[in-house]
Amino acid sequence: MGQKIHPTGFRLSISRNWASRWYANDRDFAGMLAEDIKVREYLKAKLKNASVSRVLIERPAKNARITIFSARPGVVIGKKGEDIENLKRELSRQLGVPVAVNIEEVRKPEIDAKLIADSITQQLEKRIMFRRAMKRAMQNAMRLGALGIKIMSSGRLNGIEIARCEWYREGRVPLHTLRADIDYGTSEAQTTYGIIGVKVWVYKGDTLGRNDLPAAVEARTDEERRPRGPRRDDRGARPGADRPAPRVARRPPMGANTAPSDGSDKPAEATGAGAPKPAVQRVRKVAAPAAAADGKGE
């Protein structure tokens, strides 16, 4: 059931990492997890126009470090860093510990699944045709290096009475391959007809480990290669070194005189016990005239 499972949860600890990285005992785990959910909801509402892809929350000893991945870091920082300072104070008040906020820029927002889904939902809320929005997003993703993309929209598309689901795919999106780097994102559009959900899968290629590929091994040049010496066995000599070279019988060239020296009319190749026998020719006998057979002609 590769279509049903969550691509990120399926690849955790293989090619994906957790969005919240901290340890807690059984008593504090639920409370800290609820705090993370509230922080993400707050940042989603606060930075709605900043194109936020994901939020990474880390909790070192009695501190918190929040990394915001955004395609528009200038909107998050604000004029002279005022917005980010206000953000730090609000997050520290919610978590109750000192908070450090880092901003990471998303270089290619066109191939980020979350940003693609948010872009489509914004267009749907502006009453743009969903097929046009989906196909435009797919073209931009394939143009910027994605190997495959799949977009699915569900709900009352174009305001119809019965909700349905439509999806489009371009390229290949291997959902069962664990080493495949599949970026998955969802978003919801609040329309006058109801909620329209958008899911996006983006295939960016294969990866090993947590986005760590082994270094390519360069081939050595001829000058760097060491000359290979003779291989020796237990007796100290190369096996087969004292073996004489095989003798190859040479055949006479085509058109040469191959007549035998004894004067026979057969060629030298045809003489001997193994020579093929000549084919037997059948001669048709001509019958004598009847008069000559009876003796009446004399």
From Swiss-Prot:
Gene3D superfamilies: 3.30.300.20, Ribosomal protein S3, C-terminal domain. CDD domains: KH-II_30S_S3 (cd02412). InterPro entries: KH_dom (IPR004087), KH_dom-like_a/b (IPR015946), KH_dom_type_2 (IPR004044), KH_sf_prok-type (IPR009019), Ribosomal_S3_C_sf (IPR036419), Ribosomal_uS3_bac-typ (IPR005704), Ribosomal_uS3_C (IPR001351), Ribosomal_uS3_CS (IPR018280). Keywords: Ribonucleoprotein, Ribosomal protein, RNA-binding, rRNA-binding. PROSITE patterns: KH_TYPE_2, RIBOSOMAL_S3. GO terms for molecular function: mRNA binding; rRNA binding; structural constituent of ribosome. It comes from the Bacteria. It holds the Pfam family KH_2. GO terms for biological process: translation. Signal peptide: none annotated. GO terms for cellular component: cytosolic small ribosomal subunit. Residues 219-245 have a biased composition (Basic and acidic residues). Transmembrane segments: none annotated. Residues 214-298 are annotated as: Disordered. Residues 39-107 form the KH type-2 domain. Residues 277-298 have a biased composition (Low complexity). NCBIfam families: rpsC_bact. Belongs to the universal ribosomal protein uS3 family. Binds the lower part of the 30S subunit head. Binds mRNA in the 70S ribosome, positioning it for translation. Part of the 30S ribosomal subunit. Forms a tight complex with proteins S10 and S14. This is Small ribosomal subunit protein uS3. The gene is rpsC.
